[in-house]
Amino acid sequence: MNAPQDRTDDGGVPVPVTPAGATGGAPAELPPSSPAGRGMFGDQGTGDVSGYGGLVRPQRSIEAASRPYGGYFDEVADALEEAYPAFGEAIEKVVVDRGELTLHIRPERIAEVCQVLRDDLALRFELCSSVSGVDYLGADARRLHAVYQLTSMTYRRQIRLEAAVSVEDPHLPSVTGVYPTADWQEREAYDMFGIVFDGHPGLTRILMPDDWEGHPQRKDYPLGGVPVEYKGAEIPPPDRRRSYQ
């Protein structure tokens, strides 16, 4: 880096430039260095980062919403109630949170509700873009939740369905007959959370080996490594057809 150049005052006489914080010929003082982080994100000892960035928050209870829900949510609820006579029995609660609509469905009714949401002309939720699982350990006896993201491409709307089951009876009707896109996603929810989708054409594990014990994304799944030992492995020589030297 070049040394600072002399500048001239208004009269054209060179005036030496002295760096801020320097005296005479001494170099300028540098700001004190910040303390070095140790471990993960500055945590020391345990390596636990759960408190970093405000990721730990008190669990809040999400209550059922009351009308009017706002936006197109009332139109969706009204159309579903009109098209589906068992609406009052099948819908456990309606939640509006963070600008999103979630219908909590009785487990045995989930496929019926999806059928109506897809086929009714006033609803037309043609696409199930996602089926995922959630484990709310300690929050409820029915701690395993299946979550369905539905999209109406006709009306450009999105809603969410949620159905909860217990670990002792983790059964839900499969929605693959209504939304074929749910096939592999239901398999993943079964593999990771142990939710059993009755009527699925081939409900097998999709990520873990078939003989794997347990469901890795349940909150009570034991953490720890699996010891694996490799013997007799041979590494082929590198491909020398290309030279990068």
Swiss-Prot record:
Keywords: Cell membrane, Membrane, NAD, Quinone, Translocase, Transport
Skewed-composition ranges (Low complexity): 11-28
Bilayer disposition of the protein: Peripheral membrane protein
Span list, region Disordered: 1-54, 217-245
Top EC class of this enzyme: translocase
Pfam families per record: Complex1_30kDa
Keyword Transport on entry: yes
GO MF annotations, alphabetized: NADH dehydrogenase (ubiquinone) activity; NADH:ubiquinone reductase (non-electrogenic) activity; quinone binding
Compartments where found: Cell membrane
Chain intervals with Gly residues compositional bias: 39-54
Biased composition (Basic and acidic residues): 1-10
Catalytic activity: a quinone + NADH + 5 H(+)(in) = a quinol + NAD(+) + 4 H(+)(out)
Presence of the UniProt keyword Kinase in the record: no
SUPFAM superfamilies per record: Nqo5-like
GO annotation, cellular component aspect: plasma membrane
EC number of the protein: 7.1.1.-
Function: NDH-1 shuttles electrons from NADH, via FMN and iron-sulfur (Fe-S) centers, to quinones in the respiratory chain. The immediate electron acceptor for the enzyme in this species is believed to be a menaquinone. Couples the redox reaction to proton translocation (for every two electrons transferred, four hydrogen ions are translocated across the cytoplasmic membrane), and thus conserves the redox energy in a proton gradient.
UniProt similarity note: Belongs to the complex I 30 kDa subunit family.
Description of how the protein assembles with itself and partners: NDH-1 is composed of 14 different subunits. Subunits NuoB, C, D, E, F, and G constitute the peripheral sector of the complex.
Alphabetical list of NCBIfam families matching this protein: NuoC_fam (TIGR01961), PRK07785.1 (NF005856)
Name used for this protein in its record: NADH-quinone oxidoreductase subunit C
Organism: Salinispora arenicola (strain CNS-205)
High-level lineage: Bacteria, Bacillati, Actinomycetota, Actinomycetes, Micromonosporales
